[in-house]
Amino acid sequence: MVDFKLSPSQLEARRHAQAFANTVLTKASAEYSTQKDQLSRFQATRPFYREAVRHGLIKAQVPIPLGGTMESLVHESIILEELFAVEPATSITIVATALGLMPVILCDSPSLQEKFLKPFISGEGEPLASLMHSEPNGTANWLQKGGPGLQTTARKVGNEWVISGEKLWPSNSGGWDYKGADLACVVCRVSDDPSKPQDPNVDPATQIAVLLVTRETIANNKKDAYQILGEPELAGHITTSGPHTRFTEFHVPHENLLCTPGLKAQGLVETAFAMSAALVGAMAIGTARAAFEEALVFAKSDTRGGSKHIIEHQSVADKLIDCKIRLETSRLLVWKAVTTLEDEALEWKVKLEMAMQTKIYTTDVAVECVIDAMKAVGMKSYAKDMSFPRLLNEVMCYPLFDGGNIGLRRRQMQRVMALEDYEPWAATYGSSKVDKSRL
C-alpha cells in the first residue's frame, strides 16, 4: 500500500523549518528592501544566513554519513517548501549552497569530502558554496557535439590547473564580499590552448573537469586572475547573487581536482543538477502555496462590494480549486522524484526522467497557480501592499533557472524517451515494457 504519511523525523523537519521561517525569515524583507542594488540586498541577508547556519539548515544539506544531518531528499524537499512559502531571501542562498556542495557530496573521495565539507557542517559562520557552471553565452547545449562547448577552460601545467574563461549566474559564486565563495565547484572544458575552439569531432562530455576553488585559492592568485565584472539586477529573487566572473590564468592546485576529467566529471555535474531539478519543484510549490493561501484568506473575508464573500462565487472558487489541485499533485511528484533519485535499484535514466518531468511540471504550473490566485482576488492583487506582485516575479524564474525547461530539461527528457529500451513506467512499476502487439 502506498503511504504518504510523514514520518516523525519528517514532521520535525517541517516544524523546524516553519519555526525558522516564521521567526527569522519574516524579518528579512525589512532589512533588504531599502537597499538599492542586487549586491547590497544580498549582503543585507547575511545575518539571516548566519542564523540559518546556527539553526542547522546548512548542515542539513549534507547527508548524515558525511557529517551532516540530512536524512533524505524527502526531508530536504519538505524543508524547502516551508522556507519558500514564507521568504525566498536567504532560502535561495541555502539552496545554492546545497547545489554547490553536491558534486563533492557525490564524489568518491573521502579525503576531499572531509576537507571541503568541514566548514559547512560546523554550525558556525556564513559559509557559501557555488556550482559554477553557467556562462554568458549559455550552457543549455554545452554537451552538443560540434558546438563550441564550455568557454571556461582548464589546462594542466605541472602540479596545477590553469583556468581561463567567464561564468555568469552561478548563485553565491562571488561570496559575501566578491572575494569568492568558501567553496566553488568550477566546471571547465579541458583544453591545452584556451584560444582554440572545441574539436567538433570530440564528444564534449569526455573533456569536462571540475575544480574546487576556495577563498584561499583566490587569495593565492594574482589580483587580476579573478575578477567580478558585474551583477545582474533581477526582476524577482532580488536578494540572490550570481555575478559575472572572469578567470584569467587562474591557478588551482592539482589536489583540488574533484575527479578524473571526462565522463565521470560530467556525470557528477549532471547528477547534481538532476537532484536540484527535483528540489526546485519544492521551491516552486512554496511560492505558489503562498499565493494560494493569501488568495484563499482574501476570498473568505472580502465581498468586493457584494453581499457575500467572494469564495461563494463559482468563478473564484474554481480558480482556487485549480490552484489547490496543482499544489497537491506537484508536491506528490516532488516526493516521488526525490524518492526515485535515492532508489539504488533503479537505472540512472529512470531517475533522470523523473527529476526532469518534476522540474518541468511543478515550475510551469506554479506560474499558473500564482496567476490564477491573482485572478481570484482581482485588481487588488496587483497592488504592492499585497504579496502577489513579488510572488509573480519570483515564480516566473523557476521554469527558467537551474536548467531552463525549454532549452534543457525537456530536451533531457526527450533524449530518454527516444531511447530504444525506454520504459515509461519503470519509476512506478519497475521494468515494464509497453506491449506493442496490442497497439
From Swiss-Prot:
Induction: Up-regulated by nitroethane. Pfam families: Acyl-CoA_dh_1, Acyl-CoA_dh_N. Catalyzes the oxidative denitrification of neutral nitroalkanes, including 3-nitro-2-pentanol, 1-nitropropane, 2-nitropropane, nitroethane and nitrocyclohexane, and may thereby protect the organism against toxic compounds. Has no detectable acyl-CoA dehydrogenase activity. Its EC number is 1.7.3.1. This is Nitroalkane oxidase. It comes from Fusarium oxysporum. Belongs to the acyl-CoA dehydrogenase family. Optimum temperature is 40 degrees Celsius. One of its GO terms (molecular function) is oxidoreductase activity, acting on the CH-CH group of donors. Keywords: FAD, Flavoprotein, Nucleotide-binding, Oxidoreductase. Its cofactor is FAD. Homotetramer. SUPFAM superfamilies: Acyl-CoA dehydrogenase C-terminal domain-like, Acyl-CoA dehydrogenase NM domain-like. It is an enzyme of class 1 (oxidoreductase). Strongly inhibited by mercury chloride and KCN. Optimum pH is 8.0. It comes from the Eukaryota. The active site is at 402 (proton acceptor). It catalyses: a primary nitroalkane + O2 + H2O = an aldehyde + nitrite + H2O2 + H(+); a secondary nitroalkane + O2 + H2O = a ketone + nitrite + H2O2 + H(+). FAD binds at residues 131-134, 139-141, 169-171, 304, 313-314, 375-379, 400-404. GO terms for biological process: butyrate catabolic process; detoxification; fatty acid beta-oxidation using acyl-CoA dehydrogenase.
